Amino acid sequence: MSFIKPIYQDINSILIGQKVKRPKSGTLSGHAAGEPFEKLVYKFLKENLSDLTFKQYEYLNDLFMKNPAIIGHEARYKLFNSPTLLFLLSRGKAATENWSIENLFEEKQNDTADILLVKDQFYELLDVKRRNISKSAQAPNIISAYKLAQTCAKMIDNKEFDLFDINYLEVDSELNGEDLVCVSTSFAELFKSEPSELYINWAAAMQIQFHVRDLDQGFNGTREEWAKSYLKHFVTQAEQRAISMIDKFVKPFKKYIL
């Protein structure tokens, strides 16, 4: 289930032609270039799905403020009622322990989702990715392959297959003078991709990388089948990586230390 998908064409219409100033620092494919477009998406969702839409840190602040009698990280963690969502959305023990009205959470770049939509105990985690179509570039980091493997394991262990989606909105833009102009968008659902086709860049902190526009959406199995298929893919890739690392970085030097 996606709250975004039914209104995607409206989002697309709003974004196409939108201009934002190019960043004063960083690359045109970096976080600074994509953030203004993410803010436009958030603004649209907040105006049209106001009761559902949060930044991840806003949701955590709201959850804890609605439960003022719950204190301490262990008690606050139980508010999630889901080990998988706890893993994906929570902050660390110390930060959760020390949270208060005077010490609210703030946005972190490594939050799992740019935007969180919540209704009837279902969560849609949305990441907004920007693509510079002016030149060919490496696909962006999407999510840690290890983090996704941990997520899949928790889904299977706790039989939590219908609580959340992880989806992506790509904003394709090009440079026009001092502006970045949106020329097209794409929307894709992670759990509709073919798990065995996800590219893991082990040299880039084990990040899964893809352009949203290019992500296959043909997977028709259950969520449990997706999770198991991804774990098989991850383990196979990790084993191959381990063999490669040993062959390259261990075997040539082992004779010097024996």
Swiss-Prot record:
Q: Which reaction does it catalyse?
A: Endonucleolytic cleavage of DNA to give specific double-stranded fragments with terminal 5'-phosphates
Name of the protein in its database record? Type II restriction enzyme HincII
At the top of the EC hierarchy, this enzyme's class is hydrolase
Q: Which InterPro entries has this protein been placed in?
A: DNA_rep_MutH/T2_RE_sf (IPR037057), Restrct_endonuc-II-like (IPR011335), Restrct_endonuc_II_HincII (IPR015307)
| A single GO molecular function term of this UniProt record | DNA binding
GO biological process, alphabetically ordered: DNA restriction-modification system
Assigned keywords, A-Z: Endonuclease, Hydrolase, Nuclease, Restriction system
What Enzyme Commission number(s) does the record list for this chain? 3.1.21.4
Q: Name one Pfam family in it.
A: Endonuc-HincII
